[in-house]
Amino acid sequence: MRLKGQNFRILVYDTTATKFKCIGMATSCTVNLTANTDDASTKDDVGGSAKPEVTSNAWSVSVESLNVVDAGAMLTAIKSMTPFTLMWDETSTTDNQSIEEASYARKGQAYLNDLTLNFNDRENSAKSLQFTGTSALEKLTTTPSTDTIAAGSYTKGQFVRLFISDSSNPALVIAGAKTLSLHVSLSLESATTKDTPGTFDVQEPTGYTYDISSNALVASNETITSNVDGQTLATLMDFYEASTLMYWQIANVSGANQRTKGAVICSGQCRISSIAVNAANRQVATYDTSLAGYGDYSVGS
């Protein structure tokens, strides 16, 4: 019988519970193992083929999952620049979580170096995680302590919105918004030296950047329409032209038009880095707004 995808899981070591736990609500995962090579062919070799020699090894893991309540924890983790202990293994078909200690199971240290949170209208909110290895991979020699996780709660994308303005407590959403994405990237540099044992690359974090993007509908005659109770293409263009330092919050929302601010997921300051208007024939006009994060963001209220 062939292994089904739901029974190949990525587990993260929980330092509080001192146990490995599966990444919750995952929909897919990928493990990449890379051998970096250098051509060792010389003038002494007969023929025209290269002779690749392995100079180092690298590995990475990516996970797609529904965006559950651990979004704040992931936002905190990536900017803490602290490596995780990861493991991948086959899991039991009874719960898709209990490990089977497959011969290909491995564990190692890795940085969460890329995080994307997506909150799109009428879609399940989702997140993408990218981990880059910073240690050798180890085979399992003893049975690691593991724990199962309960199914997490997730929400539809329309119930999370971006609030943005030039005041420190932004109260206006982007009117007519369709999509919202927050992307955080941790910069890594190779810290491998002649003193490093083995062949696996070692990484060192140097800093992080983040950006926010949104797509929204353009309202006809919006510049002369009465109050639309939200930021529009016109107001955002004014902020862009003034090079205004903006304040933003991504928060849960409720109410008839999903504009009543609830719990804040994260917040910070930004600059409007680009605005692109999309106007195709016989299609609704939209515009894309990109925000470049300014300074550290905060998690929670």
Stretches with model-predicted labels:
Residues 68-113, 227-266:
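Short, acidic/charged, Gly/Pro-enriched secondary-structure junctions
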Residues 2-3, 89-93, 100, 142-161, ...:
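Charged, amphipathic alpha-helical segments and their flanking helix caps
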Residues 133-139, 293-301:
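Short beta-strand-to-coil "C-cap" segments at the C-terminal boundary of structured domains/repeats
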Residues 63, 86-90, 131, 214, ...:
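Extended, low-complexity, intrinsically disordered tandem-repeat tracts enriched
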